[in-house]
């Protein structure tokens, strides 16, 4: 069986930074370190950090006084930041810098007097954080139909921002609908999109031209991993999302001569290796890494940890 590995795949710079923040905090301050929400959406990563002394909570009320606290890569609402400050909790902010950039874009648009529209998935932690960071009501849209259902007058000055785990391709139709709907509209430069989201989706599109089956390594609650699976399916290739090798169903590969493997931005390479090993237990496997866009982006750590 020929196995093609998509490039790039797996961890993005924001995820690497977030995990390193927790690990360095544990080294510097000692366990426990409290993390609000899953640091990234991957059970393996979360369990690994738990084993090192991290404690994951959903609300700050679960954090003891004076305990070192980390905000997840998805970002948090201002109310969460204010609660942490009121309790005098020592906070390390692992919010992805590209998410913070979206927060700042939204604030600038509000300052200009524009009604803000967020393109994203309801209930996603990043969306909740972004809506809670902007000091004004935000309209959330997830589809062209929801754009058409907006009751704002056509001449309302509006601006849009997008969830970072959505690519240019994911948002293109919604943005076009917004531009057709409103006469005075602004949005971020296309260069401001999350590089990792776009690169991984483009790699899956390339992969889909070569293989009979696509396996996406990632968590069920990972937005970007689910989207990679959808892209494979949309390209007409049988595509499956799996957390690790234990979830591999041999039936998926029964008639496949070529299999493509990729991983969401929060999935570590060790899980890709685990899936390949599971395939080897089914039959002989020859692995080839496809050429793709090289990523050399690194994000700086918080000052409190940079020198540790």
From Swiss-Prot:
Protein name: 4-hydroxy-3-methylbut-2-enyl diphosphate reductase 2
Reactions the enzyme catalyzes: isopentenyl diphosphate + 2 oxidized [2Fe-2S]-[ferredoxin] + H2O = (2E)-4-hydroxy-3-methylbut-2-enyl diphosphate + 2 reduced [2Fe-2S]-[ferredoxin] + 2 H(+); dimethylallyl diphosphate + 2 oxidized [2Fe-2S]-[ferredoxin] + H2O = (2E)-4-hydroxy-3-methylbut-2-enyl diphosphate + 2 reduced [2Fe-2S]-[ferredoxin] + 2 H(+)
Keywords of the record: 4Fe-4S, Iron, Iron-sulfur, Isoprene biosynthesis, Metal-binding, Oxidoreductase
Domain of life according to the entry: Bacteria
One of the record's GO cellular component terms: cytosol
MF-aspect GO terms: 4 iron, 4 sulfur cluster binding; 4-hydroxy-3-methylbut-2-enyl diphosphate reductase activity; metal ion binding
Catalytic site: 126
Family under the similarity heading: Belongs to the IspH family.
GO biological process, any: terpenoid biosynthetic process
Binding-site list for [4Fe-4S] cluster: 12, 96, 194
Organism classification: Bacteria, Pseudomonadati, Pseudomonadota, Alphaproteobacteria, Hyphomicrobiales
Binding-site residues for (2E)-4-hydroxy-3-methylbut-2-enyl diphosphate, renumbered to this chain: 41, 74, 124, 164, 222-224, 266
Pathway: Isoprenoid biosynthesis; dimethylallyl diphosphate biosynthesis; dimethylallyl diphosphate from (2E)-4-hydroxy-3-methylbutenyl diphosphate: step 1/1; Isoprenoid biosynthesis; isopentenyl diphosphate biosynthesis via DXP pathway; isopentenyl diphosphate from 1-deoxy-D-xylulose 5-phosphate: step 6/6
UniProt keyword Metal-binding present: yes
Broad EC category: oxidoreductase
């Amino acid at each position: 069986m020929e196995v093609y590995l998509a490039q790039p795949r797996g961890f993005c710079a924001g995820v690497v930074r977030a995990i390193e923040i927790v690990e360095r905090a544990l080294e510097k301050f000692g366990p426990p370190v409290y993390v609000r929400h899953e640091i990234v959406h991957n059970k393996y990563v979360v369990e690994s950090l738990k084993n090192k002394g991290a404690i994951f909570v959903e609300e700050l009320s679960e954090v003891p006084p004076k305990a070192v606290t980390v905000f997840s890569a998805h970002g948090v609402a201002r109310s969460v930041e204010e609660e942490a400050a009121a309790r005098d909790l020592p906070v390390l902010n692992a919010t992805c810098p590209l998410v913070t950039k979206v927060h700042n874009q939204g604030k600038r648009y509000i300052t200009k007097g524009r009604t803000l529209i967020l393109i994203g998935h309801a209930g996603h932690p990043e969306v909740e954080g972004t809506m809670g960071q902007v000091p004004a009501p935000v309209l959330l849209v997830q589809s062209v139909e929801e754009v058409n259902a907006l009751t704002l007058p056509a001449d309302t000055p509006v601006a849009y921002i997008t969830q970072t785990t959505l690519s240019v391709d994911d948002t293109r139709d919604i943005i076009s609908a917004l531009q057709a709907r409103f006469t005075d509209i602004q949005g971020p430069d296309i260069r401001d999109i999350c590089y990792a989201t776009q690169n991984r989706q483009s790699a899956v599109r390339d992969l889909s031209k070569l293989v009979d089956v696509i396996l996406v390594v990632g968590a069920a609650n990972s937005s970007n991993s689910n989207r990679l699976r959808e892209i494979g399916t949309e390209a007409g290739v049988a595509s499956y999302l799996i957390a690790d090798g234990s979830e591999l169903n041999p039936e998926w590969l029964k008639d496949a001569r070529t299999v493509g493997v990729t991983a969401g931005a929060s999935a570590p390479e060790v899980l890709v290796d685990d899936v390949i090993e599971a395939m080897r237990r089914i039959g002989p496997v020859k692995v080839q890494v496809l050429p793709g866009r090289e990523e050399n982006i690194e994000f700086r750590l918080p000052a409190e940890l940079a020198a540790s």
